[in-house]
Amino acid sequence: MNCNRRTLLKTAATLIVLPAAGAAKAVSVCPATDITIPPEKDLISSFGWVTDVHYSVQPVRRIDNEDSTRVYAHSLAKLRQATDLFNTRKLDFVIELGDFKDCKDDGDREGTLEFLRTVEREFSRYNGPRYHVAGNHDFDKITYEDFVTNVTNPGDANGKSYYSFVRGGVKYIVLDACYKDTKGNHYSEGNFNWVQTYVPDEELAWFKKELATGSEPIIVFTHQNLNYWDKGPMNNWFIKNAADVVSAMEQSGRVLAALSGHYHRGWYSVRNGIHYVVNQGLVERAPPRNVFGIVHVGRDHTVYVEGFYNERSHVCKPAKA
């Protein structure tokens, strides 16, 4: 496998991991991508992403009906592999798309908080702005306040689970769908059924105002999935009122793409000019498998999803005017 101009200069044949709690070490191999990224002068924004790290200290868990094999012991090392690469690139920020931590079935609040603090310390090795998206597992055993006070977002986004920011000529909007209903009852301490997921009325009204403010192209981040028309294996993973969110996005005429995690196998869909990229879960399976990526937005508003290792790459063309 040959390294091109956008891969790490440092390569090795293997990924070395230390599964002990709080320990992580990774030697990066040459990542594989299968798309051509335009030169920097033709890009207006670039950012790195990871999703579904599910950091915790517990045995491998197999979930047959999801074809899921969650190898928690390697999550920190795989995250380090991502941040090591991100630190070699010129990025506007990095973002994790939810389910940052997990918990033990017999765990407690303090132990679960330590998982969150540990994975946040690892993520903070990235030398730049870092953002977080709320995922359902982020509220196992801990409260909403526990989560937002133990992760750090830049500036006005700190302490919030939904927010917007502008970087590099692109507006980014983060939504929180970890609500049990549209009235605003948030997940907390495991008091929820993960398939019941909503963007509440108050947040949806805020979202519509954000879509109408400014003139930049927009990328939306969620943990749970919006592509509700893709019936089949993903049915339990959709936001229940996704149709309302998607309608607002389509009416705005500004949204280029929506990125999410949650469905660990990944998915891609496009509807009415908006691209829906569901990224694969980092926790799945043992090294050398890993999944993370970098997104680049071109001056022509093409979105390039540069997948590394086992993650897929996409070229998302903007809708024709």
Indicate residue ranges for each PLM-predicted region:
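N-terminal secretory signal peptides and thylakoid transit peptides that target proteins
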Residues: 1-19
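N-terminal active-site segment of His-dependent metallophosphoesterases
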Residues: 27-110
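Extended active-site neighborhood of metal-dependent phosphoesterases/phosphodiesterases
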Residues: 30-41, 65-69, 105-213, 244-255, ...
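Alpha/beta-hydrolase fold active-site loops
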Residues: 45, 92, 162, 170, ...
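Residue-level marker for buried hydrophobic side chains located in beta-strands
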Residues: 47-49, 94-96, 132, 220, ...
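Active-site glycine-centered loops adjacent to acidic/histidine catalytic or metal-binding residues
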Residues: 52, 98-99, 135-136, 223, ...
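Short active-site segment of divalent metal-dependent hydrolases/proteases
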Residues: 55, 102, 138, 226, ...
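Short acidic, glycine-rich surface-loop motifs adjacent to enzyme active sites
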Residues: 214-229
